[in-house]
From Swiss-Prot:
Gene Ontology biological-process annotations: maturation of SSU-rRNA from tricistronic rRNA transcript (SSU-rRNA, 5.8S rRNA, LSU-rRNA)
InterPro entries: P-loop_NTPase, UTP25, UTP25_C, UTP25_NTPase-like
Any one Gene Ontology molecular-function term assigned to this protein's record: U3 snoRNA binding
Gene assigned in the entry: UTP25
Name by which UniProt lists this protein: U3 small nucleolar RNA-associated protein 25
Lineage: Eukaryota, Fungi, Dikarya, Ascomycota, Pezizomycotina
Parts of the chain that traverse the membrane: none
């Protein structure tokens, strides 16, 4: 069953705070459906007898082309239409090849572009309505790693790979090829028993670094020296020149983290900003491209060895179960466009198949009415903000192919929801997530934005990474690496997570899903505190009230009791003067959790304690008309109280007028929201002084430590969490 996009599993499926401006955006009038067809085993047997190429097979079959045929499996959008167009071309080639005789395999022919011009190739389908539909999956012959070179003579393969000889100091060789099985087992045993040893240090920009390694005998954690530029990295020649042109200079922070990224260690980076996001995007794109090319290079060299020594007993293990090696999880289609722009400027292919279709369905212009919106809002929601998408990407020697089928892809880019729609079949059909079995690099960018969609989808995807496949998918098991066969791939996979801030959910991902034997690091900022950056002309009193909570499970109940017995009682008294005469209104109650919002809304509507209290409510599921009505009634004073959720602010960034005092049922996850919401007090200049006197009151417990650190600052947090010394703290 496909879960909804809200943070609560029972919430409406299609609602996501009202967002969804993207072109087409996968929201067609047709109900999403999946199709699957299984090719009979006899077909596979016949194909093998006819010389069909599997993973690791010789690359001399004339009928193998770069583009997958109609029997290839799990696809991204539009691949079915593309295959229908390519089939006549395949048939023509087969007819032309029949006259070459059977005296042995013919030398592969390849069109040579002597002018070396870049060409964008468009493969049009017959039904454009499928362009943004669902992945149409079929089971058939799978693509081998290195298949893109099958139509290229081996002397050309050697020419392309010249100058990229194996280097024992290359992190790729150390992590994937020259693996000591005994040491690997020791590290996995330590990780399984949570035996990590850690070392803390400082990074440039007031960041704190915690480096962790599996606790094995005689191992000492070493802080890696900074890398001053990409020239010092072990890059493929095809990438080195363009990397130098586009990533010419690294700042001190990026230089400190590059050795860990390119050293295949896991990274949780909790200081993503608008200023550094492009740099780290370019770096991780360079890293995954380097990984894809080196993986292909190793497969091709080993294929060449097997061709030269067909009767030898060489054991060359250089592959996984399936071809996809990189998974990049992103929040929106426009974020996917930015990643593709980084990839294409670093890997400058002569041809880009379906590029125009990609930009037509993934990119859009910014909304001109958003000029007053904050910069972080425009970065996240600018352009095509649809959050249901997936894209397969295939690389050949001269071509980048968009919308390649998943089992023929090198990189998969997707949103958590878009990927889950593929993994979870409707109508009782068989689930399919084998294409995630051989992921060696997983990247989560803008993880904080994914939290506001439905983090459960992200957790679901990670729970299905590197599982043993249910079907062979044309795999040559004699070429599969041992740690894949031993179900140890998750301990070799590198995971890179980039977020503007770190939450308990992201920390849980770091603890439970990032189990790399190469080690892992966490980079977190030292916060000055959002309370110091309030956009008001006069000082405002900011009060924090701590309540006791024995466990995270009991925290919602303890918070509700404290609110109704202490905060709400005081609030109701302040609304009524002598003789029951109503006094000033204008109280905004900010609520981070939708579930808490529903509970408080129902309590205010039914409790005798609040029978004389008028209130309005705005959540991420409130219609535009009801939002306008609630805001109008609150501004006019007809409603004394307005309930307002954090996800509403995330998706809309409303400017609420008429606010004279603010109660934070809980502090926001995003520290930017603190200043924006407190700034509501100054939207009416005439009443700014009165509003500043009303001030802000926020509730917190010790389980809110991560959020509170961002709001009050790292140095102030310790005293505020102590059990002794009072439970109320005020700042002006």
């Amino acid at each position: 069953m496909a879960a909804g996009r809200g943070r609560g599993g029972s919430r409406p499926f299609s609602v996501r705070g009202g967002r969804g401006r993207g072109q087409k955006g996968g929201r067609g009038s047709r109900r999403p459906t999946f199709e699957a067809s299984r090719v009979a085993e006899a077909h596979h047997e016949d194909s093998s007898e006819d010389g069909s190429v599997h993973l690791g097979s010789d690359l001399d079959a004339e009928d193998q082309l770069e583009a997958p045929d109609e029997s290839s499996s799990s696809s991204s959008d539009d691949e079915e239409d593309e295959n229908r167009t390519e089939k006549p071309y395949n048939t023509l080639l087969q007819l032309l090849n029949t006259g070459q005789g059977v005296g042995g395999p013919a030398r592969k022919r390849r069109k040579m572009d002597h002018n070396s011009k870049k060409v964008d190739v468009e493969v049009k389908g017959s039904d454009e309505s499928d362009a943004e539909g669902l992945l149409l999956e079929s089971e058939g012959e799978e693509s081998s790693e290195g298949e893109e070179m099958e139509d290229m003579p081996m002397d050309e393969v050697r020419t392309e790979n010249s100058g990229d000889e194996n280097d024992a100091s290359d992190p790729f060789e150390i992590h994937f090829s020259n693996v000591d099985s005994t040491l690997l087992s020791q590290k996995i045993k330590a990780i399984s028993s949570k035996g990590w040893q850690s070392h803390k240090s400082e990074l440039p920009g007031k960041l704190r670094l915690m480096a962790s390694q599996p606790n094995t005998e005689g191992h000492i954690i070493q802080v890696l020296p900074a890398t001053q530029g990409v020239d010092n990295l072990k890059l493929k020649q095809k990438l080195a020149k363009h990397a130098g042109d586009h990533i010419s200079k690294l700042d001190s922070l990026a230089s400190s983290l590059v050795p860990y990224i390119f050293g295949y260690q896991d990274l949780l980076f909790g200081a993503r900003t608008l200023s550094n996001s492009a740099t780290f995007r370019d770096l991780y794109c360079l890293h995954v491209l380097n990984h894809i090319l080196k993986t292909r290079d190793r497969v091709l060299k080993n294929n060449s060895r097997l061709q030269k020594e067909p009767e030898s007993d060489l054991e060359l293990r250089d592959q996984g179960f399936t071809r996809p090696k990189v998974l990049i999880i992103l929040p929106t289609r426009q974020a996917c466009v930015r990643v593709m722009e980084s990839i294409t400027k670093l890997y400058q292919a002569e041809q880009q198949e379906n590029k125009a279709r990609f930009y037509e369905t993934f990119s859009a212009a910014d909304d001109k009415s958003w000029e007053h919106k904050p910069d972080d809002f425009r970065e996240l929601f600018g352009g095509n903000d649809d959050d249901m998408f997936r894209l397969g990407l295939k690389f050949t020697r001269k071509t980048i192919k968009y919308f390649s089928q998943f089992y023929n892809s090198d990189i998969i880019l997707a949103s958590p929801l878009g990927l889950r729609m593929v993994m979870d079949k409707e109508d009782g059909e068989k689930q399919d997530f084998d294409f995630l079995s051989s992921i060696e690099i997983a990247i989560v960018d803008q993880a904080d934005a994914l939290l506001m969609q439905n983090w459960e989808h992200t957790e679901y995807v990670f729970s299905h990474l590197n599982l043993q496949p249910k079907e062979s998918h044309g795999c040559d098991f004699s070429r599969v690496r041992n740690w894949y066969l031993d179900d140890q791939a998750k301990y070799v996979r590198q995971t890179l997570t980039f977020s503007s801030f770190i939450t308990p959910e992201i920390n849980a991902l770091f603890s439970s899903r990032m189990q790399n034997t190469a080690g892992k690091i966490k980079a977190t900022p030292t916060y000055e505190g959002a309370i110091l950056d309030i956009p008001l002309p006069v000082p405002v009193k900011q009060t924090f009230s701590r309540f006791n909570s024995s466990s995270p499970v009991k925290d919602p109940e303890n918070r509700f009791k404290y609110f109704t017995s202490t905060v709400l009682s005081s609030l109701i008294r302040s609304f009524t003067g002598r003789g029951g005469t109503p006094r000033a209104s204008g109280t905004l109650i900010f609520i981070p959790s939708y579930l808490d919002f529903v509970r408080i809304r129902n309590y205010l509507a039914t409790s005798s304690q609040t029978e004389h209290l008028s209130f309005g409510a705005i959540s991420e599921y409130t219609s535009v008309r009801d939002v306008a009505r609630a805001r109008t009634h609150f501004f006019s004073g007809r409603h004394s109280v307005l309930l307002y959720t954090e996800r509403t602010h995330h998706f809309r960034r409303y400017q609420i007028r008429g606010v004279k005092r603010i109660i934070m049922y809980g502090v926001p996850e995003n520290p930017v929201f603190w200043g924006e919401v407190v700034g509501f007090l100054g939207l009416d200049p005439a009443g700014a002084a009165e509003a500043a006197e009303g001030g802000v009151r926020a509730l917190f417990s010790k389980w809110d430590a991560l959020k509170m650190e961002r709001i009050v600052g790292t140095k102030r947090l310790g005293n505020m969490l102590m059990e002794k010394g009072g439970d109320t703290f005020s700042f002006v």
